[in-house]
Amino acid sequence: MRTRDQEEFQRKKIMLMEKCYDCYAENGLASVGIRKLAESCGCSSAVLYIYFRDLDDLIVQSTAYCMKKVEDDFMAKAPTDPQDLMRFIDEIPYWTARQHGKKYRLMYQVYTHPKYIRYGKQFFEGVNRRYTEYAKSLEPKLGIPYTTITPLIFILIQTCVHYAMFEDECYLQSQLEALKQAIRLCMTQYRTEDARPDAKAES
């Protein structure tokens, strides 16, 4: 296949994955068949089988691609300045719910299904790697080891996802308050340690 043909094939495949995922997100995994997917894409069922082996392949690839895009959207909003951190923590759950609530509900339908759970494990292995790298980038700015930052990021992500799916304000506020307290304690602790005379001597 020529490069231009490959690019066009991939462009069309991405469009199909996005439209199919949106269709599932609006209607639920169990309520949508190949015919309804084709209608949402403006094509015939046969066209979908050019790009995907079967319905399972379409579901797996569409979920992985679209949720990676959601993750990219989240990371694009993530602060690099520590001064923006608390504001970000307060705002990001509501943004996540508005922008991606339906997509997260569908993701959990897919990745908790016995047929697809192994793909969910693979997806979240990638998530773990990417957020660990983000934590490493924050380490010199916050003065907190990335091994401490990483679990705090995971708590924030889980809190955002839970709120996006269920809009549970009580759970959200309790988690955010605990998270912000933990961050403040960590920042105080590591600043205190850095200020110790023996710490300066070691450095």
Regions inferred by a protein language model and the residue ranges of each:
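Short, basic, alpha-helical segments at the C-terminal edge of helix-turn-helix-like DNA-binding modules
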Residues: A64-V70
